[in-house]
Amino acid sequence: MHAGLLGLSALLQAAEQSARLCSIVFYFATGRLLWGWLALSVLLPGFLVQALSFLWFRADGHQGQWWLAVLHLLQLGVWKRHWDSVATALWKGKEAPSWGQLHLQEADLSALRLLEALLQTGPHLLLQAYVFLASDFTDIVPGISALLSWSSLSWALVSYNRFLGIMKPGHHTMLWAALLCQQLWRMGMLGARVLSLVLFCRVYRVWVLVVGGAHWLVMTFWLVAQQSDIVESTCHWRLFNLLVGAVFILCYINFWDSPSRSRVASFYLVMLLENSILLLLATDFLQGVPGTSLWTVVGVLSGFLIGCASLVIYYSLLHPKSSDIQQSFMRKCCGPIEDNKPESEPPPRAVDPTGEMPDSSSWCQEESYELTSLDKAPSPEQNTAEVGLGEQRSGESSFFSHHHWLLLKLALKTGSVSRINAALGGDSPGCSCPPLLGSSQHCDLQRKPLFSHQDLPSSPCDPLTLEKGSEYVGAPKAEMESLETSSYLSFASELEDNATTQKPPATQEDSPKLAGSKADLAAQGKETEGPLQGKEGQESTTLYFSAAMDRTTSHQRGSPVVLRISHSETLVESRPGQPALPQAVTKPFPVTVANISPIPGRNFRPSAELPGRAPDSSECEEWKDAARDPSMQSSLPKMRLKAAEEPCFTSTPKSESIQRDYSCRDRVRQEMSFFI
């Protein structure tokens, strides 16, 4: 089937280009120089397609660039791709690499052929249809050229749609009936649009440019409102919308991954209204219409009806997901339908009569071949853990800048790497996702939890124990891209308060810092030993600290961060009935982070049973003693408190006793820096 479709495409393209050359010769031979030069100028946009084809050949690593350049200068670059695809389909068996190579060649050929048809065949079709209609259907050469251009442009759209199905994982082979139905759909819609524009241009001349420009602007704004994510760059995204808006003057192409029923219906409804208005204006509301104009009106209406009927038949009967489309349409029209079956069975896969449909496992191998063959084949040493980060980044950048990456985004109708990975890796259990799509350091960082149970100290008697908290696992990638989790760590507590804040995602440069912070936590947490000693009271004290994990600093053993705690105050657990903990031994603080600020907890107040100290002054004297200690000032780094205009929002409520102590603590904050 591949060879037959490629042969049909080549035959149709050869006939269309031959008729184009014959029409140019015909115009110059009959003295119609204006039409001859206009038909000749239509060939100029083809050089853009040839230049793009040559660049793609170079990106694929083809040798003999000098003769490739000559072929493309002679407008034969697309023909070279036709020859390569037919040769691959006929002479190279059905091995997985051969099928993968054939799919890549067909993808390149379909994309370039569609671009060539839109830039060359579309304008040539409008020109030849106008000449044929202006001659009252008497000039045979422009009529034949217009007919072949019409068929060639329609087949280019069908081939592009088939290419989209080939590039998708677990694709279904299209039957000949589906291809024929798509051809009728495209020919009907294109014929109605071209005839209405040509008939209006025949009467109002240049005003057809106003109609086309207005339609272009409306379609461009509609595309902007749809927010396609195929192109990431802002400048390229705007250019993409402008170009697709120009394409929508003649035909519709889907660039969105969501269901397109409403978009297709809206587009063709607008086209029907525009065509009807243009016909009514061109024929003076069907009063005194000549015979040629009347036949043109009949052709427009019949073409639109044939296109609509073919469109409905294709999506209801011949589409690979036709059963799902029917069920969705019935649910939308008639509400939910009760089914006796517990689960809806998937639609049967369309089987080609020749039996050339690859199964899902073979397709996974082909897709893996397609994407991994874009760069150099990795050596056995590179498959081990010794692969450097620089090599991964270079392979990533080379793949993301390759033209096959653009074709893959067009096929899956999305530019999101996570969605492309999910589509390629979730097709079947045995499908091996290409490593280049899954080796993004940024994605790995998002999927990696910030803390694990092994990294945190787990001793229940440690004075500064970081209890096992909730890990950030199972979070969707879309949420992890916009959310960053900061932990509020409790001393001598079994609870960990997590607050989720809206922050930009961590960059790739911050990932070594995160890894270093985790290593410091694991190493220093094991060294921290020694129980706290104190008395059990009715009221307990819990100290909360906020750690900004995106700005961690490496901790040096030579300059430990010491937490000075008064012996007269007890740090006990918030739960009632907890036995008294022994006295704490001064040890290095296991969490070495910058910008640590004390956050008062629910029970953060001095103990009522502490003798020899007033309840209102115990906390103030403790911090003042820490500030006056010269040995502590020389050995500890100074860490400023956060500014008053930048409060730290926490999920920890504040008790009424804390508010009574604010005046004393505010005076301390103005006199000293905070030491840990």
UniProtKB/Swiss-Prot annotation:
It is found in: Cell membrane. Residues 336-362, 372-391, 495-538, 598-661 are annotated as: Disordered. PANTHER family: XK-RELATED PROTEIN, XK-RELATED PROTEIN 5. Belongs to the XK family. Its main location: membrane. InterPro entries: XK-rel, XK-related_scramblase. The gene is Xkr5. Residues 498-509 have a biased composition (Polar residues). It is a multi-pass membrane protein. This is XK-related protein 5. It comes from the Eukaryota. The keyword Secreted does not apply. Keywords: Cell membrane, Membrane, Transmembrane, Transmembrane helix. It comes from Mus musculus (Mouse). One of its GO terms (cellular component) is plasma membrane. It holds the Pfam family XK-related. The chain crosses the membrane at residues 37-57, 114-134, 140-160, 206-226, 239-259, 266-286, 294-314.
